[in-house]
Structure formats: C-alpha cells, structure tokens
C-alpha cells in the first residue's frame, strides 16, 4: 500500500531541493520554476493567491454594503463588487483551464491517444511547527523544547518538500513519509484535551478557494488527497502505445481511486469542495473509468495484428462498451449538483465525449466480428450473449443471424450506430472551447469515424433495398480479473492456501455448508463426511473449483457449479485464515516510532465534549460482522448445504 509506515530517511527523491546536513529528508523537485511541472505548480500558486485576495476584497465590500445606508456609497460598492466577481470568474476559468491542460501531462511515447484527466495537487502555505511543538514539549512532557530543534527542522523540511513532489515513485514515497510522520504526531501530541494550536492552510484543488482548520485530520486528509492526485498525474503521462505503459497507467489510476475511496470513507466535515463526499465519489468513478480505458487500450495493441479473429473483436466490443458505461456514470455524477457548480465544464464535456466515442467503438468492433468471419458451432452462443441482455428482466432482441448476408446487414446496422456516435462525439467536442484546443482528441475521434465510414462503404451495395434493422446494444463486460476481495485478501489477515483437494459425492452431498458471496465461505462441515476427510474446515474460503478461480463468484454460482458435478467429484482449493499474531508486550515506548499500530492509523480521536461547530475528523467504522466472526450456520437463512 502507498500508505504504509516508512522510517524517516528510507529512500531518496530528486536532489533539487535545498541541501540537508545528513541527507535523511527526501526531496521534491525543489524550485517551483525549474521544470514544466514546477512552472504549472507556480502558476497555480499565483492563481490561488489572487483568488484569495479577491475573496477578501469581496467579503469586505459586502460587509460595507450591508453596513452603510448612503445611496452613493452603496452604488459605488455594488459597482466594485461587480468588478470583483468578474475577476473571480476569470481567475476560476483560468484555473479550470490549468486543471484540464494536457501539455504538461502528455504521454512520453509517440502514439496518438485520447488524453486523460489528471488532478492538480492541493497547494498549501508554509507552516511553523517549531514554536507550538517546543511549547508543548516543555509544558506537557517537561523537557527542553530547544533540544529537539533538529528533528523539528527535519519535519518542516519534509513538509516543504511535499509541496512540489516529483511525479514518480520518489514523489509518492515523499508524501507517504510525511503522512506517516503526521500519524506519529497525531498519537503523541494531539488529543481532545490538548493541541499544539497549529493552523493548517490549504487551497481547494478545483476552485482555488482557501480553507483552514486547526485539526490535524485536515492536514492528513490533504496529504492523502495529494497522493491520489499524484497517481493521476503519473497515470496521465504514461505511454499507452505499448503494453507496459497501459499497465502502468491502469495501475496508477486504480491506486488513485483507492486513495480517494479511503478518503471518502474515513473523512468527514470537509471544509473545501474538492474533499467533500460528492467530489471524492466522482473522482473515484473518474479514475475507475480511466483505468478501464487503459485496459481497453492495452487490448487493442495485440488485437491490431490479427483483426480477423472473431473472439478478439467480440472481446474488444464488450470492453469498449464497459468503458462507455463507466464514462456514462462519470458524466452523470459530474452533472449533478453540487459537483457541477465547481467542477471544470471541460471535464464534464470530455467525459460525455468519451462515453459517445467508446460506445461507437463497441458497435464498430461488433460489426467487424460479424462481417469478417463465420462463427463456429460453439462460438454462436458466445456471440448471442454479447448482443443479448444479461438480465432476464430486459426484453430479448432478435436472434443473431447465421447466414452471411443477414450478418452483413446486421454489421451495417452496427456501423451506422458507430458513425452516428462518432459524429455526436465530434459535435460535443466542438461545443467546448477548452476541448477545441486539444488536437489529439479530435484526431482520435476523426480517425475512428473514417474507419467506420470506410468499412460501411465496403459493405454498401447498389441493390440494398432492404429495410434497415436496428442494431442491439452491446452488453458491457470486462475480462480483467479483479484482485481481492479485500475483506479477506489484504494485509489485515494472515491466510494459508490449501489444496487442491479432490472430493467425491458421498451419500448425496459433499458434507459441507456454504454461506456468503465473494468469496464463498464454508460455514459448517458435517462430522465424518467427505469434506472433513479431505481436510476442509469451518471458516475456509473457496477460491478455486476444478481449476477455475472463484474468489469473486456469488453464492449461487458456486452452489450451481458443485451441484453439476458427477461421480468424478470436484477439486477444490481453499484458503484458511490464520490467527492474528499476539500483541507485542508492553515495554518502554520509543521516542520516534510507536509500538501500537493503531496509534499510527487513520483515525483521529474525536472529543467527548460537544463543539459549537463540527471540525474535520476521521470516522470510526463499526467493523463487527467482518472476517473472523462466523455465526452459527443453522441460524443463517443464506446457508445452503451442497448436495
């Protein structure tokens, strides 16, 4: 995980920061103006300062307008307010253009790909840790605060370096190291009864509006937000014209989605719009969609060498439909208030363009699969599943034709929908002033439109007087194997892989009871049955059935698979959770690190007394009923005994 605990001084960043005596502090790229990312950060910082100045002027003018009753003064103040509001609007539009700038985040390769949406880092002001920490050390711990000046200076240098992290693993390590130090500080110096009295000042990443709080959770949340934002910048600059680049980009966007989800689930009372629950949920969906897009781009690379293979084209059609579905969800989330009020309009338009573009690509690849090969006997059912709805509640479409002429007609219908979709994407592209400057986006959509038109011309005949058929929707599906589930397969649990274990049906059943979904749990084992003889135990999780991974299978899928087994039996592979290690014995507390892992976790103890205004805090979730507690299967209505 990117939020793991790291000792101070482990790993190095770039050496452009100010020099240190012992070299233990990792560094960012130092000056704001040494390179292109630094220039962008410097421009954002200047815009944030100007926005903050205009906001203060507007607040003062509004107070004067309410306080005076002089008509001439009120008219003059109203005129000045109109100027201030105009300046604020221009500054926010300029900041939005910076947020959608693709010049800095161009992929490193030469391939032409659709640009991604990177997220800018949150800016902050310099913070004086020395004075409040020295006072607290002297008053509470009874030690000389001046004897810790070196350590406090290292902390200040580390925070200063996190303002300009390098866009690589060193930058991520830098932010994670500072986050770990904040966890240590939270456990040692912050409590409901005492606090160093620091004021943390951060600017909103989307609007540039300043926010400040005295809660350390605000500082921790802002650093975690920057970890996710830095992952988006790393993913956006990958070269998606090669397999390695698409894999790195997909991984970076998935990690960004994980950071935003962790922040959303544990963060409350956000003082800035970019850290609100609605914004974080939208950002999580956006990163998932961009990761899915990278997966699709990776599949295009090997498939381009063999375009006449029908299974590859069908897979590409479903993957493109999956990307279109994800971007459709993102576009709806961006269009909902209050997100649409402060989100750059170009982001919403780009998500809409991508939804139309990838939906058109899905129909294009479906047409390629229909017209370039005749399906085998076993392949027809698979093609039917691609074009038919996956749920029984939706009406079934027409049966997939087998005759070449009928397949050509259906392919033309899909190409027609592809052409209409690409034309709609180009129309949406021209409506946005910011997107019109992105030449790569127009080039990619135009190339896709030309491919569809060329293929449609090949299928067009002079004697085509038949009634045009309506092409069915492509069922979205991704063939990417997910990792996890995290409820079991994470660093919180220790487990052991058992098997494969072969069992045969004895006296009508395999001798165990199943419960739960993803993964399915063995809730009970019949004494003396086949499962007990094979070594299966209560609490084991089934991860493989006859060599097929089933960690993400639903309960019904596993039961159906087991019931279909004949006299040959079944081969299962399970994982057994191991007991957690006993807590370490109580001993002298170290000065730098803490014994208890909870002390450097994500929670901040909430005060017992009520406050007049809610402050930003980390919520504690109720973790009961999770892994490790197995209720009696006889009282669980979801239990099913495998026959």
Swiss-Prot record:
Highly expressed in testis. Residues 30-104 form the REM-1 domain. GO terms for biological process: focal adhesion assembly; glomerular filtration; kidney development; negative regulation of stress fiber assembly; plasma membrane bounded cell projection morphogenesis; renal albumin absorption; signal transduction. Keywords: Coiled coil, Phosphoprotein. Residues 1-43 are annotated as: Disordered. Residues 115-462 form the BRO1 domain. PROSITE patterns: BRO1 (PS51180), PDZ (PS50106), REM_1 (PS51860). One of its GO terms (cellular component) is plasma membrane. The keyword Transmembrane does not apply. Residues 15-25 have a biased composition (Basic and acidic residues). The modification Phosphoserine is found at residue 31. The keyword tRNA processing does not apply. Residues 500-577 form the PDZ domain. Residues 32-42 have a biased composition (Polar residues). The PDZ domain mediates interaction with ROPN1. Binds specifically to GTP-Rho. Interacts with ROPN1. Belongs to the RHPN family. Has no enzymatic activity. May serve as a target for Rho, and interact with some cytoskeletal component upon Rho binding or relay a Rho signal to other molecules. This is Rhophilin-1. The gene is Rhpn1.
